[in-house]
């Protein structure tokens, strides 16, 4: 985790140094504050001690997120940023730190964009109480994260822009659950005794202000 954080900080420093050497009339430092909502997609297959499927859990998680980015626009079509934020799930929360690459397809007031985020999500908190419906605890460990999206940037003036995008997110983390033990009381509503890795998928929208 420390190596990931150091790598991302070093990347931002490299962006700053490179930007100072390659300035153009349209180059500038940029900041963006954004927030959004995404809903869970797909299924998670849980295994028992013998490697057989125990049950399938629907990804009913949701993700409410807020981010801040600091970066550099090299020209009207390309920018790179370092981002950090908070991701709030139903029973847990993450602090993602990531590198952002954004491509603008035009240099007009209304610009179609494509962006890609990649980094690592640290834990903020997690509840140990299983979900009442599925009797699992989602998102219990740190892990790599990614996001991609397409949208529209609306340039209000030379400094301020609105960004609206449809996004797809994923988070690699642990899911905790209970493997039934014969002749023992079922405590799956209160605790867990098994854990496995899972890749969570989300789709949603992001709204931001760049300045």
Regions found by a protein language model. Give the residues of each.
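Residues that define the transmembrane beta-barrel architecture of outer-membrane proteins
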Residues: 27-29, 60-64, 93-97, 110, ...
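Membrane-embedded beta-strand positions of outer-membrane beta-barrel proteins
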Residues: 31-35, 82, 101, 114-118, ...
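Outer-membrane beta-barrel "beta-signal"
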Residues: 34-38, 197-211
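Transmembrane beta-strands of outer-membrane beta-barrel pores
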Residues: 37-41, 86-90, 103-105, 118-124, ...
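Outer-membrane beta-barrel translocator domains and adjoining extracellular loop/strand segments
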Residues: 43-51, 92-98, 125-133, 175-182
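Glycine- and aromatic-enriched membrane insertion/assembly motifs of diderm outer-membrane
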Residues: 50-106
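Repeated loop/turn-to-beta-strand initiation elements of outer-membrane beta-barrel proteins
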Residues: 77-80, 109-112, 154, 158-162
């Amino acid at each position: 985790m420390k190596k990931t954080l150091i790598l991302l900080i070093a990347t931002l420093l490299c962006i700053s140094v490179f930007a100072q050497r390659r300035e153009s009339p349209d180059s500038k430092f940029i900041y963006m504050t954004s927030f959004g909502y995404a809903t869970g997609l797909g299924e998670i297959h849980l295994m028992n001690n013998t490697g057989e499927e125990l049950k399938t859990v629907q990804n009913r998680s949701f993700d409410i997120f807020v981010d801040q980015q600091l970066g550099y626009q090299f020209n009207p079509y390309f920018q790179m940023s370092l981002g950090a934020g908070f991701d709030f799930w139903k029973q847990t929360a993450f602090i993602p730190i990531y590198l952002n690459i954004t491509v603008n397809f035009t240099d007009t007031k209304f610009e179609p964009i494509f962006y890609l985020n990649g980094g690592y999500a640290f834990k903020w908190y997690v509840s140990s109480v299983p979900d009442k419906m599925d009797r699992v605890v989602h998102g219990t460990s740190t892990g790599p994260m990614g996001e991609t999206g397409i949208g529209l940037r609306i340039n209000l003036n030379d400094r301020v822009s609105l960004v609206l995008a449809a996004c797809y997110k994923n988070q690699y983390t642990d899911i905790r659950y209970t493997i039934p033990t014969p002749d023992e009381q079922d405590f799956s509503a209160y605790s867990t005794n098994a854990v496995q890795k899972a890749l969570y998928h989300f789709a949603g929208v992001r709204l931001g202000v760049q300045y």
